[in-house]
């Protein structure tokens, strides 16, 4: 399973990129709005900051309701950073989103269909040609449903029908989500920087480092 970072914060993206574990970036209108920057400018900055990732998801804005409006926005977004091949168009899981997905896929544009909450939605998106689908774990957990089970069902379905669409586990809130979706068959987990930090931490690791440092301080030095 690969790691994307789910943020529009440039500093967090740069920190994650330096770790050598980052395969992509996902953004959405809410994340960009929180940064208080122009959407297109931030996507360009992200592309420049992480040139070796496979995907930077740029989502069409909520005022694009029809397939035609989504496609028009997508055509502008893929021009960002000189037509950067890493820009992936993120589309909502609606009928219009599916129509736009099919059109963009036929043009060779990578797509990420987001706000997936059922297996049937994932199957429709895959059949429309989506490069990625993004099932949301945390939001399902909030209504007492099992987001990890959804990922497992989608993974099984894609395997049975030999679908190439990749699963991005989204709305990931803690390390246990990451462990469980990796075991469930997600290709990618897109996570906030704070979860990346949590994945790297364990109190016994800290204690071990402190013990090594204390013992080394006592060792004879040449």
Swiss-Prot record:
Its EC number is 2.2.1.2. Disulfide bonds: none annotated. Gene3D superfamilies: Aldolase class I. Its main location: cytoplasm. It catalyses: D-sedoheptulose 7-phosphate + D-glyceraldehyde 3-phosphate = D-erythrose 4-phosphate + beta-D-fructose 6-phosphate. Belongs to the transaldolase family. Type 3B subfamily. This is Probable transaldolase 2. It comes from Bacillus cereus (strain ATCC 14579 / DSM 31 / CCUG 7414 / JCM 2152 / NBRC 15305 / NCIMB 9373 / NCTC 2599 / NRRL B-3711). The gene is tal2.
């Amino acid at each position: 399973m690969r790691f994307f970072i789910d943020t529009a914060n440039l500093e967090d993206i740069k920190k994650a990129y330096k770790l050598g574990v980052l395969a992509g970036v996902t953004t959405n209108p809410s994340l960009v709005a929180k940064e208080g920057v122009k959407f297109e400018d931030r996507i360009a900055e992200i592309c420049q900051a992480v040139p070796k990732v496979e995907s930077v998801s740029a989502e069409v804005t909520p005022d694009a309701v029809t397939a035609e409006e989504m496609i028009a926005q997508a055509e502008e977004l893929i021009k960002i950073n000189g037509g950067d091949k890493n820009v992936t168009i993120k589309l909502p899981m609606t009928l219009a989103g599916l129509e736009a997905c099919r059109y963009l896929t036929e043009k060779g544009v990578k797509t990420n269909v987001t706000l997936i909450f059922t297996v049937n939605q994932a199957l429709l998106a895959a059949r429309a040609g989506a490069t990625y689908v993004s099932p949301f774990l945390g939001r399902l957990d909030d209504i007492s449903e099992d987001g990890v089970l959804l990922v497992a069902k989608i993974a099984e379905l894609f395997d049975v029908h030999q679908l190439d669409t990749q699963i991005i586990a989204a709305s990931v809130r803690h390390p246990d989500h990451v462990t469980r979706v990796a075991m469930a068959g997600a290709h990618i987990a897109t996570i906030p920087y704070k979860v990346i930090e949590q994945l790297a931490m364990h109190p016994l690791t800290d204690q071990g480092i402190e013990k090594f440092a204390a013992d080394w301080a006592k060792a004879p030095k040449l």
